[in-house]
Structure formats: structure tokens, C-alpha cells
Amino acid sequence: MTQTRATQRGGNDSVSAVVVDDSQFMRTVIVDMLEDAGIDVLGTASNGADGVETVLESDPDVVTMDLKMPGVDGIEAVDRIMAERPTPVLVLSAHAADGAELTFEAMEKGAVDFFEKPSGEVSVGLKQQRESLVSTVRSVANADVSATEAAAERTRGDAAGGVSAGATPASTEYPDRPTLLVGASTGGPTVVEGILEALPVEADFRVLVVQHMPDGFTGRFAKRLDDASEYSVREAEDGDRIGGGEAIVARGGSHLEVSGYGGGRLRVSLTDDEPVNNVR
């Protein structure tokens, strides 16, 4: 029976962390925020190599990982951690375009989720997001890394072999243009990518993807899904219409609603209504 870290802690809500960031100022801010919330910070590191060593020595429940660091960067550090001692990793990502690309590379290596660093005055921005950061750290700490990675590898392997996970032969009869809804939060991007890779083309799905992710990242996420899948994938726009063989990704910071149907195509709307369960 696979155990999450919460189960391994005997149901104890206490969480331990290691903070890796090349900025001493950022390390101090993050450590203070986590410790103020009752999270036990076992150690810090200013580069990827020291970060890996600290994780191996202290065996934390979660690691917060900067990406751009001298020497061993965050992507290589995530790769080493997952190879030597699989541990849930939360990437702290910059909003810039290259930051988004690096973030997805880190998630390919096994990072569970990411948290967007605020732009502008870093200390002010982070403190305003204290509650969200702490909540994300706790959620990532409880992720079952082995199960998530195994599922992603299975779907990738099946797709590469031409048979999707749980797929039926090509001769199977599907409903006319069925609609598939995919919703995900912590740890979702890698799994969602595996699902899109494995979807049978002959099913001609209309796919709606809602992945909790900041605006500015969902467009690049859609591009990655488009590259990985035989379906045509794009970021949703207000009033978009979607037919069979197409997939859309809800824009970060917006709700995605199905507002109409005609000629085999769905019409969707984007709204900025109040968050539901603290997300939008």
C-alpha cells in the first residue's frame, strides 16, 4: 500500500522543509514565513548542489526550490533529488517567459508544483502571499511523489507504444464528439500532460482543461500540451468555440464556463467571478 508523507507522519500535521535559493534575503523571508506558520525548516542552501546534500541529510517533507542558481541549478537539483531521495519539491518561479519554461522543465524532472514569485518589491509581494504560499507548501508536502511519477510514466509509456492507458482498440465505437473535462491542482501539470498524450485520436474528444495556474503560465502550458498531444490544444479565449479533436486550457485567473452549443461545437466564456474554494 502506497503511503503519502502525511500517512508516514502518522497523521501528524507537522511539516518539515528545506529552502533552496541563491538569495540570502529570499531565504530569510521564506524561512520566516514558513516558521511563523509552524513549519519546521530543517535547513537552507544557496545552490542546487548544497540543496541536494541538505535534503539527503535532513529528509524533509518538502523542498522549496529556486531555479536560477550558480553551479547546479534548480532543474538539475530536482533531477538529483528525485533520483536519490524522492521528495516533494515546490518550485519558486519567476513570472518571466523564460521562468515559465524553466518551471515546466523542473516539473518534467519531478517537481510537484510551483509558486509564482511576485514581481516588483519581492519582500512586500511575498508577504502579501504568505497564506497562499504556506497552504501550497503544506499541500505539496502531502503529495505522493512515487505514485504521481509512476502514473505519469505509465501514461507516457502507453502513449509511446500506441496504446493509451485504459484505452480500447481503434475499432471501438465512441459517442459522437464526446466532451472530456480535466481538472487539476497540486501536481496536476505532469499528469494532465500524460492524459492528453494518451487520448485516442479516433475518439474525437472535445477537451476542456482547468489547471490551477497563474495567468502567464497557462498559455505556455497549452503550447506544451499541443506539442505533446495529437489533439489541437490552445489557451481559451472568451467566446471560443471548440469541436472534436480540440482541447482548450482555461486562462489563469479566470473561470471557464460552457455558455452554448451548436453544430457539434461548444462555446465557452471566461469570467472573473468570485473564486470558488479559493481558486479561479
Task: Walk through the language-model features, giving the residues of each.
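Conserved acid/base catalytic micro-environments in cytosolic active-site loops
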Residues: 2-6, 11, 16, 24-32, ...
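Conserved acidic carboxylate
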Residues: 21
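Hydrophobic "anchor" residues on beta-strands that sit immediately upstream
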Residues: 17-18, 62
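Short hydrophobic/Thr-rich beta-strand motif most characteristic of the beta2 strand and flanking loop
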Residues: 38-46, 54
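Active-site beta3 strand of CheY-like receiver
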Residues: 58-64
